[in-house]
Amino acid sequence: GYSSAASDVYKRQIETTLDRPGYNMYCPTAIIMPSNLRDSIWGKEDDACALENIFLAAHSYGVGSVWINQLQNICDTPAIRDILNDFGVPADHVVYGMAALGYPDPDTVIQPKERIGKVAYIE
C-alpha cells in the first residue's frame, strides 16, 4: 500500500493535470485500475467489461462504486505517467477507467425511482 502522504500527492497531481480544483476522485477507500495495451483493438471494451464485473461484485458485498474515466486522455502526461509507473502500469498501457470503491454514507436517503409504466418507441 501507499502512505496517506503519497496518496495526497497523487490526488493533487491528478487534480492539477485535469485543471479541476478540489477534484478528489470521490474520496474512495480503494481504487482498482485496470489497464490495457495502447494498441489493443478491444482494450477499452475489455477494461469496461472488467470494471462492470468489479461494480457488480462490489455491490453484492454492500460496497459502493463509481466509474472514473479521467485518466484515459492524460496517461502520457509526464506527471501522470510517473504515478502510473509507481503503480506498476506498463508504459505501453492506457487506463481507460477505474473503479473507485467505498462504503456509502449510512445517512444518505435514496429516493425511490418514479415508475411511469410507459415505453416510448422511436422510429
Where are these regions (language model features)?
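Single conserved hydrophobic/aromatic residue that forms the stacking wall/gate
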Residues: 1-6, 10
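Helix-adjacent hinge/juxtasegments
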Residues: 12-39
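A generic local secondary-structure boundary/capping motif
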Residues: 20-23, 55, 85-89
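Short gly/pro-enriched beta-turn/loop segments at secondary-structure junctions
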Residues: 25-28, 60, 94
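Small-aliphatic-rich amphipathic alpha-helix that forms the alpha element of a beta-alpha
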Residues: 32, 37-83
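Short, structured secondary-structure boundary patches
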Residues: 79-93
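C-terminal helix-cap and adjacent tail motif
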Residues: 89-123
